[in-house]
């Protein structure tokens, strides 16, 4: 468990919006990033429930109490390992997911929920900053080639998992650039294209 009294002593704090007079000059993301130290305190609000309903609320089944505890303790390396165990692209979901896990959070029964989405986002951003997002190379190649049709988030996740299993993967898309919905359906103020390109660079190494 993280901080046993964290949910009582630490109030929920969500990221602040950038000033309007600044936002109207660009198409960058609306919210200001929160510091790692700030998110450590927010992670301490997790109760590590006996039955963590956030698991059932999360479509991916993310191991939320585990990486909340690791972030609170400052173990960023193990935290990103636990996050990547169930989520190929937390930098996408940390920005775009409507966070049903927070609605399911047990803390929310009597007070405000843990800021799970922001903790997830800061965990992956810290991992990129520290160089802890590295390709997982297969021990051996299977000699099989797999075609993935469509380069949206599902196609990219499939390609990543198949590559890790040792297959040679070719991704096809009708558009000029890879990314699908992430590139052509999500506006820049929700997720900047540089975030997608950063992950694609990591996947093609």
Where are these regions (language model features)?
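Residue-level detector of alpha-helix initiation sites
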Residues: 88, 110, 152-154, 177
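N-terminal Rossmann-like dinucleotide/flavin-binding domain of flavoprotein oxidoreductases
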Residues: 80-87, 119, 182-205
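Ferredoxin-type iron-sulfur electron-transfer modules and their immediate structural context
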Residues: 1-145, 193
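Generic beta-strand/beta-sheet core signal
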Residues: 49, 149, 172-174
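N-terminal Rossmann-like FAD-binding beta1-loop-alpha1 element of flavoenzymes
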Residues: 145-170
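Glycine-rich FAD pyrophosphate-binding loop
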Residues: 167-183
């Amino acid at each position: 468990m993280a901080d046993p009294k964290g949910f009582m002593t630490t109030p929920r704090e969500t990221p602040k919006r950038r000033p309007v007079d600044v936002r109207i000059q660009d198409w960058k993301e609306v919210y200001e990033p929160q510091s790692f130290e700030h998110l450590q305190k927010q992670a301490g609000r997790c109760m590590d429930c006996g039955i963590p309903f956030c698991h059932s609320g999360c479509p991916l089944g993310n191991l939320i109490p585990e990486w909340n505890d690791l972030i609170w303790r400052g173990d960023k390396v193990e935290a990103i390992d636990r996050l990547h165990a169930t989520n190929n692209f937390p930098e996408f979901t940390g920005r775009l997911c409507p966070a049903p896990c927070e609605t399911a959070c047990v803390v929310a029964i009597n007070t405000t929920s843990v800021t799970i989405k922001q903790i997830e986002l800061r965990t992956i951003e810290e991992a990129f900053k520290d160089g802890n997002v590295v390709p997982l190379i297969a021990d051996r190649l299977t000699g099989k080639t797999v075609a993935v049709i469509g380069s949206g988030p599902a196609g990219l996740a499939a390609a990543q998992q198949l590559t890790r299993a040792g297959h040679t993967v070719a991704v096809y898309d009708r558009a000029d650039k890879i990314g699908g919905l992430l590139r052509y359906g999500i506006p820049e103020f929700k997720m900047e294209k540089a975030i997608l390109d950063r992950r694609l660079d990591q996947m093609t190494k």
